Amino acid sequence: MEAVRPDSCESGPAAPRAEERPAPEARVHFRVTRFIMEAGVKLGMQSIPIATACTIYHKFFCEINLDAYDLYLVAMSSIYLAGKVEEQHLRTRDIINVSHRYFNPGSEPLELDSRFWELRDSIVQCELLMLRVLRFQVSFQHPHKYLLHYLISLKNWLNRYSWQRTPISVTAWALLRDSYHGGLCLRFQAQHLAVAVLYLALQVYGVEVPAEGEAEKPWWQVFSDDLTKPIIDNIVSDLIQIYTMDTEIP
């Protein structure tokens, strides 16, 4: 199977800026990762397992043509596999029922008939395929622990009034969660993503870091020495594209 290397799969400091308008593939992946996130929440998954499921999904389609397999089957298998990787094990029956209700709101759970067992077997077989395609490399370093550390540090820098009157922390976490709609988790380092969402959250509310003008280097470089402004700009640009798709896709 010929591998595909879309922009969202490129990694490293020199990752290219996103195009002005999201590619059709990006819109498809947006829909499917939105399903992963919503299904994950209904299944009671924590933020890290959901992030892992999205990353597995994105990484798989960096190796496989978009039309080679059913996207939502891959998504369900990504959820199932992520639960194992992050030790939040999920039953295939629950994944199937949540997915069924996602596409058929108000419907009853599927009967344990041949259709159910065929779907269950498909999820398990797809999981094995994904493990082989990804060469069993399904553990990832996520930005969450870095963002938590950076938020604690920033809270100590800012005055109490600035911190309490603006939802910087809530916004940064929301930006990080939404970044998994795209391939940012593959294109950029975890530390860089964590700093960039914090940078954007501060920009949104017009909050300035104290003594920024007198410091030898910007606050964001204190958190990550190899981070540059162009990398931050690239991440912010990709995030803006994600929110643009969110307004355009029903």
Curated annotation (Swiss-Prot):
Tell me the domain of life: Eukaryota
- A Gene Ontology molecular function term of the record: protein kinase activator activity
List the Gene3D superfamilies hit by this protein, alphabetically: Cyclin-like
- Provide the Gene Ontology terms for cellular component: cyclin-dependent protein kinase holoenzyme complex
Q: Which parts of the sequence are annotated with region: Disordered? A: 1-23
What are the BP-aspect GO terms?
positive regulation of MAPK cascade; regulation of cell cycle G2/M phase transition; regulation of transcription by RNA polymerase II
Q: Which UniProt keywords apply?
A: Acetylation, Cyclin
The entry's family comment says: Belongs to the cyclin family. Cyclin-like FAM58 subfamily.
* Oligomer status and interactors: Associates with CDK10 to promote its kinase activity.
What's the stated role of this polypeptide? Answer: Activating cyclin for the cyclin-associated kinase CDK10.
Name this polypeptide is given: Cyclin-Q
Q: Please tell me the species this chain comes from.
A: Mus musculus
Tell me the gene name.
Ccnq
